[in-house]
A protein has these predicted regions:
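N-terminal ligand-binding lobe of clamshell/alpha-beta domains
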Residues: 1-255
């Protein structure tokens, strides 16, 4: 069996063209299908909502941070695909003792392209992966380069958590023309006083993981009257697979 190196610099022995794949990451599930691998995908998480209806046809092996190891064992996977941030490492450590586990570690669009290329290599779909990367690259090239203004992007309500540097969302915010005012890396907690002091032009409330709604817009708008507060599609800012094809069109449609 050939050896491959994943994005955590782990060398994995993976069979040529694996036939029983489990995806532990929603964006990668969609990517695998778009690479033509739906028939070889046997297991996914309860959060793998795209493509619609796929969960009814496949085995749900739990969530991204709680795996049902008995269900995984019953599927007899010859490849499991995960992510450093989205999956819990204790579970990954147990899985990699029994199965080939390929992990991604993504902070930028370039990392996402490397991941797509890597999955193409380990699944025998390199040509399809290259076409997808080319399509996304071409689309991104037409993204307006103008600055929209300063922004804070929230992913959680209580405690209030924002997106900082060293995250994929931070990279995509910059590509969308936003200047992220949050300087602390990863996902720092903020207070309302912090938000008022930052005084962003835009307060972006993500649809996931916390499901911000119109009532939250109203709450923040009352506290930050000079800031334009709006809901944004978290999938379009945080999913780093084939959904990137829709990023430019979505961003250009934002108010």
């Amino acid at each position: 069996m050939p050896f491959f190196t994943d994005q955590m610099n782990r060398t994995i022995d993976i069979p040529e063209k694996p036939q029983r794949i489990i995806s532990l990451v929603p964006s990668k599930t969609e990517l695998l299908v778009d690479l033509g691998l739906e028939d070889r995908l046997v297991g996914l998480t309860k959060f793998c909502v795209h493509p619609k209806g796929l969960k009814k046809q496949k085995t749900i092996i739990g969530g991204t941070k709680n795996f049902h190891f008995d269900k995984i064992a019953a599927l007899q996977p010859d490849l499991i695909i995960g992510n450093k941030e989205e999956n819990y490492q204790e579970g990954i450590a147990l899985l990699e003792k029994k199965y080939p586990v390929w992990m991604s570690d993504i902070y930028t669009l370039e990392d996402a392209f490397e991941m797509i290329k890597g999955i193409g290599a380990i699944t025998g779909t390199a040509a399809q992966a290259e076409r997808l990367i080319h399509e996304i690259n071409q689309d991104m090239a037409f993204l307006s380069q103008g600055a929209r203004g300063t922004a804070v992007y929230l992913i959680w309500k209580d405690p209030m958590m924002a997106v900082g540097p060293q995250t994929f969302i931070h990279d995509m915010l910059g590509r969308a023309g936003f200047i992220n005012l949050v300087q602390e890396p990863r996902y720092p907690e903020l207070s309302m006083e912090d938000l008022k002091n930052l005084s962003p032009d835009f307060l972006l409330l993500s649809s996931e993981p916390f499901p911000f709604k119109q009532k939250h817009i109203d709450e923040f708008a009352a506290q930050l009257p000079q800031t334009h507060t709006q809901l944004v599609d978290g999938e379009l800012f945080s999913w780093y697979g084939s959904r990137l094809r829709y990023f430019r069109e979505y961003v250009e449609g934002l108010n």
